[in-house]
């Protein structure tokens, strides 16, 4: 399970995100959207994420 402050990415690829909150099944992650030139957040199930190395 991930904790607040962890850096993660989708297993399928994508931007580096920081975990800003967690639950038993998911993590809310914040990332910078270059397309919109602003920060955004998304809730993703833990199984779809991996630690950024």
What would you call each of these model-derived segments?
Residues 7, 11-53:
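Basic/aromatic-rich interaction segments and small domains that mediate binding to polyanionic partners
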């Amino acid at each position: 399970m991930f904790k607040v402050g962890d850096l993660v990415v989708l297993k399928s690829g994508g931007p580096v995100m920081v975990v800003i909150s967690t639950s038993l099944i998911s993590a809310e992650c914040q990332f910078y959207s270059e397309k919109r030139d602003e920060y955004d957040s998304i809730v993703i199930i833990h199984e779809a994420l991996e630690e950024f190395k």
